[in-house]
Amino acid sequence: MSSAGNSKKSVPVRSTLPEKAKAVAGEAVQGALVDLLDLSLVAKQAHWNVVGPRFRSVHLQLDEVVDLARAAADTVAERASAIGVSPDGRAATVAKESGIASFPTGYISDDDVVRAMVAALEAVSVRMRKRIDDTAEPDPVTQDLLIGITGDLEKHAWMFQAEMGPR
């Protein structure tokens, strides 16, 4: 169980959310944090190891995903803290709870990187949409935050799909 559900420790930050809403929102932002941290790591791994004729364009686009994922991870972690939920971005938590498939080691072709990034972005987007649905009633502020991030993720998924073009 992630720290989002840990209510045994004293919480120095009070939330204006009722406990049930706080639990739902906390679980949503913790899950988003894990997925976004892993997405940033996957994109950076791909960035270092991409090879092929489209190296430069894919390499640069991967940096954009890294920047987005890192900024969004910080945003959702701060939302967790703001509602009195301690965020857990430890490597062990990310490895255990991420919804992104394992990324291969070694050099990887630009085509394979693009396919892997589409899959990773889609996996995170699907999970984010579930979180959007889950937070609609209990915490529209968290929902709004997740909607904005999901829009950015889906934009990058589209851009990577456009990289593949008709083949």
Where are the language model's segments positioned?
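Acidic, low-complexity proline/glycine-rich segments
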Residues: 1-15
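A structural signal for well-ordered alpha-helices, especially hydrophobic packing surfaces
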Residues: 33, 40, 47, 66, ...
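Helix-loop segments that flank and shape redox-cofactor active sites
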Residues: 16-24, 39-64, 127-141
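Conserved alpha-helical segments that form or flank metal/cofactor-binding pockets of metalloenzymes
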Residues: 51-93
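Charged, amphipathic alpha-helical segments and their flanking helix caps
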Residues: 56, 63-74, 133-150, 154-158
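Short, charged, low-complexity loops and linkers
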Residues: 15-30, 101-112
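Acidic/histidine-rich alpha-helical segments that form the ligand environment
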Residues: 78, 92-148
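Short amphipathic alpha-helical segments with heptad-repeat character
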Residues: 23-33, 37, 63-66, 70, ...
